[in-house]
A protein has these predicted regions:
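Conserved SAM-binding motif I beta-strand of class I
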Residues: 1-5
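Conserved SAM-binding strand-loop segment of SAM-dependent methyltransferases
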Residues: 22-32
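A short acidic, Gly/Pro-enriched loop at the edge of an enzyme's catalytic core
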Residues: 33-44
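Conserved Class I SAM-dependent methyltransferase catalytic core
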Residues: 78-137
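Conserved SAM/SAH-binding beta-strand->alpha-helix loop
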Residues: 7-9
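Core SAM-dependent methyltransferase catalytic element
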Residues: 119-122, 138-167
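Mobile active-site "lid"/loop adjacent to the S-adenosyl-L-methionine
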Residues: 39, 48-81
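Conserved SAM-binding loop
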Residues: 14-15
Length: 167
């Protein structure tokens, strides 16, 4: 098992959890782009940033206790990381390999499916669940209403898991 995370705290946490569980894994600090250099993999599980982000100056100040901004901020449509990840996913996988990708319904699920399929991957939504807005989306709810991503008063989002298989 090889794990990549851009956040140093997450890397330390993963190493600690592996030690407690008595398993040996290779944990590296880096983005999915760094993972391309170690590819191909049989299974890739990805939870990239996917939260739509207001333009500079329109974003309310979020508590530092929520974690680093890069853990969720993903550009105005939520696809800043999703789009290049989906376009490169086939390069992360060996033949017969699978990608499991989690994202918000606010960040263009069909776009992800189309992008994955355009690289000859077989892609489908395999799980979805509606959940209440967490603190980040709650802070951005007014902006999300203004740009039409959520209807007025809506305070829940759909999270989906996409599976993409490489033949």
């Amino acid at each position: 098992v090889t794990a990549f995370d851009i956040c140093p705290h997450a890397v330390r946490c993963t190493l600690g959890n592996a030690t407690v569980a008595g398993v040996q894994i290779d944990v590296r600090q880096g983005s999915w782009i760094a993972a391309l250099r170690s590819a191909p993999f049989e299974v890739v599980v990805a939870n990239p940033p996917y939260v739509p982000t207001p333009p500079e100056g329109e974003n309310s100040l979020l508590s530092a206790g929520l974690g680093p901004w890069w853990a969720w901020n993903a550009g105005p449509d939520g696809r800043l990381v999703l789009e290049p990840l989906c376009a490169s996913a086939a390069n992360l996988l060996c033949g017969g390999g699978s990608l499991l990708l989690v994202q918000s319904g606010l960040a263009g699920v069909q776009q992800s499916l189309d992008s994955l399929r355009s690289t000859s991957l077989e892609a489908e939504v395999v799980a979805s669940e509606r959940i209440p807005f967490g603190p980040v989306l709650s802070e951005r709810a007014g902006w999300l209403e203004q740009i039409g991503l959520v209807r007025r008063g809506c305070r829940e989002e759909e999270l989906v898991v996409i599976r993409a298989d490489k033949p």
